[in-house]
Each structure stands twice: as structure tokens, then as C-alpha cells.
């Protein structure tokens, strides 16, 4: 399996995102249980418009392909795609050097995947501070 995922990760990120979106939507339509749970969860959260339902499937598929790309690409390649504002970098840098505990809340799984790579490639080198990602 490792060799297959390594091979998949060599494909361009944009292609993987598009492919993942197609697979995610296909799974959404072919799995009645997944589709029902998705609709129920969205309705409970106040999203009743049908356009949201298939977007969840597409984005879940996209995220799965992005994760493979992040996990199996060299850190330098991943870091070359990270965009962060100077203000955010300053805030995170200050927190890292403070020695105080930090809790990172990320908007989706992809950010959760990239955050440790980014921290290791930037602030860890400066501070030597270890982090735990849960």
C-alpha cells in the first residue's frame, strides 16, 4: 500500500484535488448510508439547501487526496505551497518562543496535516520546542 500511495502522491496536487472531488461525489451518490448521515448532520447544523449535500462529498474526497500528497511529499515541497500572513506568522512565532502551551484550532483536516510540517520547518528550528498534535 505504501508504494501505491507514494506513486499517487507524485501526481500534481491540482489533479489529485479534482480526482478526489470526483471520487468523493461518486461515493456520496453510491452510499445511501453516507448520504443520509451527511444530509442529517448538515440539517442539524442548519444547512438545508441541497447544494451543500454534494459539496460535502466532493470536499471529503478532495481532502483525502490532499492528505496523501502532504504525507508522501518532501516537507520542502509541502512548505512551498503554504501561504501565511506576516501577522499570523508573528503571532505563532511569539507563542512558540513564549514556552506557554498552545492549542491550534484548524479549519479542516488539510490544515491539521500541514501545521506540524510547517512548524517543524520554521519555528521548531528556531526554538527547538516540541509539539504534540492530537
Predicted regions and their residues:
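Membrane-proximal helical "anchor" segments flanking the first transmembrane region
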Residues: 1-103, 110-111
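Catalytic core of membrane glycerolipid acyltransferases/transacylases, capturing the structured
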Residues: 64, 98-134
Amino acid at each position: 500500500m505504501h508504494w501505491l500511495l507514494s506513486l499517487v502522491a507524485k501526481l500534481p496536487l491540482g489533479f489529485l484535488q479534482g480526482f478526489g472531488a470526483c471520487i468523493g461525489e461518486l461515493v456520496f451518490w453510491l452510499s445511501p448510508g453516507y448520504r443520509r448521515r451527511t444530509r442529517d448532520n448538515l440539517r442539524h447544523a442548519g444547512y438545508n439547501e441541497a447544494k451543500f449535500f454534494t459539496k460535502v462529498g466532493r470536499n471529503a474526497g478532495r481532502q483525502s487526496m490532499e492528505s496523501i500528497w502532504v504525507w508522501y511529499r518532501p516537507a520542502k515541497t509541502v512548505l512551498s505551497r503554504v501561504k501565511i500572513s506576516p501577522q499570523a506568522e508573528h503571532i505563532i512565532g511569539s507563542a512558540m518562543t513564549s514556552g506557554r502551551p498552545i492549542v491550534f484550532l484548524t479549519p479542516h483536516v488539510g490544515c491539521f496535516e500541514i501545521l506540524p510540517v510547517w512548524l517543524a520547518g520554521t519555528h521548531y528550528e528556531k526554538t527547538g520546542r516540541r509539539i504534540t498534535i492530537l
